[in-house]
Amino acid sequence: MKKQELNQAFTHVFGREADATFFSPGRINLIGEHTDYNGGRVFPAAITLGTYGAARKRDDKLLRFYSANFEELGIIEISLDHLIFNKKDSWTNYPKGVIKYLQEAGHSIDTGMDVYVFGNIPNGSGLSSSSSLELLIGIMAEELFDLKLDRLDLVKIGKRTENDFIGVNSGIMDQFAIGMGAEKKAIYLDTKTLEYDLVPLDLGDNVIVIMNTNKRRELADSKYNERRTECEKAVEELNVLLDIKSLGELDEETFDEYAYLIKDAKRIKRARHAVSENQRTLKAKKALAAGDLEKFGRLVNASHVSLEHDYEVTGIELDTLAHTAWEQEGVLGARMTGAGFGGCGIAIVAKDKVAALKENVGRIYTETVGYAPAFYIAEIAGGSRVLSRK
């Protein structure tokens, strides 16, 4: 969406020009799935699909929100003095949480805003539309109220909004990737220390294709929180003899030696995924840095296998996409990305084989599942940013 279109859309809804326009990306995760809340490593990248916004500062205490994605809801009005979760307020609960926690952190947001939002991340696709929105609202407030805001602090406020305001027990990966993203680079992040490297994403003659199951997933209502609880229980059981804060501290050899302490076969599988995926992510970074794309692809495939069999978060939709992609010519690797239970997969595929991938995977998926998937090329983008000022 062009800056001029954003301004025109804002003026059409609110009757006045915006003070500034903004963009906040979505994200994919190359590898390192369900490791961020297990104290492990992740390897995400911001993408050019994302959330556009325009905003104007008000003189009163009114927050007015409008989303072009939810036109039927019209303008949703909320008082700055009444920032509490209310299911009736739909998507605006995310902005409310961000503003509330910015205020609690000592930042002065003393008047309201008019906010226009348009996202081209498919809702429920697992490409982090909610985190994209959280960071968008954060940079709007930063710009309009001249806040002296450290980007990492804003990332943490986004995570807190997700956890404490919305009620989803997610890790920090999504907000970090969206807030700290850089063009043509992936972020290798240690979620325990928040130390990170920006790694050039040089895929040669290959591209990343996002494969959308078109099965919407509702994170808070899914088994996401259940998986986290299973892993936390496994840590408790391992700590009968070990002294660890998270599964991310273990290598596979140590885990295999002490896995007998976990008293439930299902929890052993969950913990084994967290440990092995963490090690795969470390190997994947090294493979990418060395230009060994074939090894990188094999690790991506192994990640899906572990998510399918040990963590059990895939389902027929994601499995059909990944398994079918593995059989296609020119595919280095494919797996689910995001929390699972629907959402999207990714495939790393030769540029000249993309059309065949779409045709073949699309056909087999439609025959198997009963409706068609969608495909997009993932361009790697910079993080949340101001597009224009008045």
Swiss-Prot record:
Active site: D174
EC number in record: 2.7.1.6
GO terms, molecular function: ATP binding; galactokinase activity; magnesium ion binding
Compartmental location: Cytoplasm
Any one Gene Ontology BP term: galactose metabolic process
PROSITE patterns: GALACTOKINASE (PS00106), GHMP_KINASES_ATP (PS00627)
Major place of residence: cytoplasm
Binding site for ATP: S67, G124, S125, G126, L127, S128, S129, S130
Catalyzed chemical reaction(s): alpha-D-galactose + ATP = alpha-D-galactose 1-phosphate + ADP + H(+)
Gene3D superfamilies: 3.30.230.10, GHMP kinase, C-terminal domain (3.30.70.890)
Site features described as Transition state stabilizer, chain residue numbers: R27
Residues binding substrate: E33, H34, T35, D36, Y224
InterPro entries to which the protein is assigned, alphabetical: Galactokinase (IPR000705), Galactokinase_bac (IPR022963), Galactokinase_CS (IPR019741), GalKase_N (IPR019539), GHMP_kinase_C_dom (IPR013750), GHMP_kinase_C_sf (IPR036554), GHMP_kinase_N_dom (IPR006204), GHMP_knse_ATP-bd_CS (IPR006203)
Keywords attached to this entry: ATP-binding, Carbohydrate metabolism, Cytoplasm, Galactose metabolism, Kinase, Magnesium, Metal-binding, Nucleotide-binding, Transferase
Family of the protein in this entry: Belongs to the GHMP kinase family. GalK subfamily.
HAMAP family: Galactokinase (MF_00246)
Described function: Catalyzes the transfer of the gamma-phosphate of ATP to D-galactose to form alpha-D-galactose-1-phosphate (Gal-1-P).
Protein name, per record: Galactokinase
